UniProtKB/Swiss-Prot annotation:
Main subcellular location of this protein, as a coarse class: cytoplasm
GO cellular component terms, A-Z: chromosome; cytoplasm
Family note: Belongs to the archaeal histone HMF family.
Record organism: Pyrococcus horikoshii (strain ATCC 700860 / DSM 12428 / JCM 9974 / NBRC 100139 / OT-3)
Location of this chain's protein in the cell: Cytoplasm; Chromosome
Subunit structure: Homodimer. Dimers then assemble into higher oligomers, with the DNA wrapped around the protein core.
InterPro entries documented for this protein: Archaeal_histone_HMF, CBFA_NFYB_domain, Histone-fold, HmfB-like
Name by which UniProt lists this protein: Archaeal histone A
Chain segments carrying region Interaction with DNA: 20-22, 54-57
Described function: Binds and compact DNA (95 to 150 base pairs) to form nucleosome-like structures that contain positive DNA supercoils. Increases the resistance of DNA to thermal denaturation.
PANTHER family registered for this protein in UniProt: ARCHAEAL HISTONE A
Keyword Ribonucleoprotein: no
Record keywords: Chromosome, Cytoplasm, DNA-binding
Length: 67
């Protein structure tokens, strides 16, 4: 884990209205977002394979998010 940089996550939290963000808070959210993104990606890969493709397309990602 730890693929997502902390700075963009910090900016997301600030966009949500926070004035200050602890480094630990940004790290925890980054870890959660990464886990969630991996789950979506895994589902999208399944959809692409089911369709007989090796390439994950936008529609695979959208379906994975909805499922």
């Amino acid at each position: 884990m730890g693929e997502l940089p902390i700075a963009p996550v910090d900016r997301l939290i600030r966009k949500a209205g926070a004035e200050r963000v602890s480094e630990q808070a940004a790290k925890v959210l980054a870890e959660y977002l990464e886990e969630y993104a991996i789950e979506i990606a895994k589902k999208a890969v399944e959809f692409a394979r089911h369709a007989g493709r090796k390439t994950v397309k936008v529609e695979d990602i959208k379906l994975a998010i909805k499922s």
